[in-house]
Curated annotation (Swiss-Prot):
This is Glycerol kinase. PANTHER family: GLYCEROL KINASE, SUGAR KINASE. It catalyses: glycerol + ATP = sn-glycerol 3-phosphate + ADP + H(+). Glycerol binds at R82, E83, Y134, D244, Q245. GO terms for molecular function: ATP binding; glycerol kinase activity. Its EC number is 2.7.1.30.
Length: 496
């Protein structure tokens, strides 16, 4: 009896395997962290083999602890840290360099050159993205330009490229399936989101051979099966793939046009479903593909904040202000306000709507009376201000006024932050019972492909609210606070 869907959630700092049942409930999960490599300031890399090892480990742990046999699994859904690029040898299956992570700024110079050559408008029109080190295309170019012999091998058709989803499907299927889905392809800087094809003009710009690229498929279909020895003697269908933020939008059942979610993970990502039309942004947002399912493609507007949960980690590990991230709420609640203190956590630059990779973090309004509590509160508040920056851009571009914001990710457990978020946005914030919406979205996509769930209506019924945070702050106060944040941003940008 096929009782479960297995979701593999390959994130920036850890890999997880989560088993879901028919009601969309978590049966069991396992997690394993892996090494972050920082070869130079601003560079972030992962070992793709270590990521693969961590995936095998969490599958084994999750199934054995839950006492679930592989033959009870109806299908596998995969969701992944997006943009992170892997290039590997087709024959040996070994990566030729570390995976270059989405956060890494090592291709900033390549991006500057492309902008100087006047490619920005063409890239914007075709991909919905900006020329930025964040996206995969320049990472692939960097690997081909900097690893000895790589370009020659690529031109001979001996190398393969993939985002993490592609790497995992390739490994799980024993090298049979070299595929990605629309949502991940739309983040590469090489994919035309309107005609849904790899784009020759973009590939020429980046000097990336087409033979390296995976086949682009819908987000919900059977791409292949696991090979026996990776899945303990069973061929299980690999049936759903979506980038982490798009998977969360799906897991939050944001199927209607104008519905939006914000995920508070390492970074913060807000996506609004714009239906079957790609809305071009005038305000520094990205136009991206949400998912492809049932022969249709849905688009989304996205705002990306580079530093969110990682700011809380920095308070814990870098500043040693507390031992556990959950303590940040306790400290922040001990003071009535930040007493005029603002923290701008631009550790790796600023994302939407500013897109400035040269800016670094800053703190303003500090006095002799500033305490640890003020500092922690100001850091938490910065997540809410950055989210408001994104929402203002979204409402301006889409012409849709947000009614409620659905939230997920590690930081949403923080009630102080969620209440402040609602106050600053002046809209209700809804936290679901199942916070693992990214993994759930991948599970839903896989389950729909194998007939485990009937349709999106059945899934919509499974979304349940844990808590709704209503705005109660006076408009005058929230506007004043936000004006202070805008001043802090301008001052941060001036200091370069």
């Amino acid at each position: 009896m096929k009782k479960y869907i297995l979701s593999l959630d390959q994130g920036t700092t850890s890999s997880r395997a989560i088993l879901f049942n028919k009601k969309g409930e978590i049966v069991h999960s396992a997690q394993k962290e892996f090494t972050q490599h920082f070869p130079k300031p601003g560079w972030v890399e992962h070992n793709a083999q270590e990521i693969w090892g961590s995936i095998l480990a969490v599958i084994a742990t999750c199934l054995s602890e839950a006492d679930v046999k592989p033959e009870q699994i109806a299908g596998i859904g995969i969701t992944n840290q997006r943009e992170t690029a892997v290039v590997w040898d087709k024959t040996t299956g070994k990566p030729i360099y570390n995976a270059i992570v989405w956060q890494s700024r090592q291709t900033a110079e390549i991006c500057d050159e492309l902008k100087e050559k006047g490619y920005s408008e063409m890239v914007r029109e075709k991909t919905g993205l900006l020329i930025d080190a964040y996206f995969s295309g320049t990472k692939v170019k960097w690997i081909l330009d900097n690893v000895e012999g790589a370009r020659e091998k690529a031109e001979n058709g001996d190398l393969l490229f993939g985002t993490i989803d592609t790497w995992l499907v390739w490994k799980l299927s024993g090298g049979k399936a070299h595929v990605t889905d629309y949502s991940n392809a739309s983040r590469t800087l090489m994919f035309n989101i309107h005609d849904l094809q790899w784009d020759d003009e973009l590939l020429d710009m980046l000097t990336v051979p087409k033979s390296m690229l995976p086949e682009v498929r819908p987000s919900s279909e059977v791409y292949g099966e696991t090979i026996d020895y990776h899945f303990f003697g069973q061929n299980v269908p690999i049936a759903g793939v979506a980038g982490d933020q798009q998977a969360a939008l799906f897991g939050q059942a944001c199927f209607g046009e104008g519905m939006a979610k914000n995920t508070y993970g390492t970074g913060c990502f807000m996506l609004m479903n714009t239906g079957e039309k790609a809305v071009a942004s005038e305000h520094g947002l990205l136009t991206t593909i949400a998912w492809g399912i049932d022969g249709k493609v849905n688009y989304a507007l996205e705002g990306s904040i580079f530093v969110a949960g990682s700011a809380i980690q920095w308070l814990r590990d870098g500043m040693r202000m507390f031992k556990d991230a959950s303590e940040s709420e306790v400290y922040a609640s001990r003071v009535e306000s930040t007493d005029g203190v603002y923290v701008v956590p631009a550790f790796v630059g600023l994302g939407t709507p500013y897109w400035d990779s040269e800016v670094r973090g800053a703190m303003f309004g500090v006095t002799r009376g500033t305490t640890k509590e003020h500092f922690i509160r100001a850091t938490l508040e910065s997540l809410a201000y950055q989210t408001k920056d994104v929402l203002c851009a979204m409402e301006a571009d889409s012409g849709i006024e947000l009614k409620t914001l659905r939230v997920d990710g590690g930081a949403v457990k923080n009630n102080f932050l969620m209440k402040f978020q609602s106050d600053i946005l002046d809209v209700p914030v809804e936290r679901p019972v199942i916070n693992e919406t990214t993994a759930l979205g991948a599970a839903y996509l896989a389950g729909l492909a194998v007939g485990y769930w009937k349709n999106q209506d059945e899934i919509k019924e499974q979304w349940h609210m844990d808590k709704r945070f209503e705005p109660t702050m006076e408009a005058e106060i929230s506007e004043e606070l936000y004006a202070g944040w805008k001043k802090a941003i301008e001052a941060t940008k001036a200091f370069k």
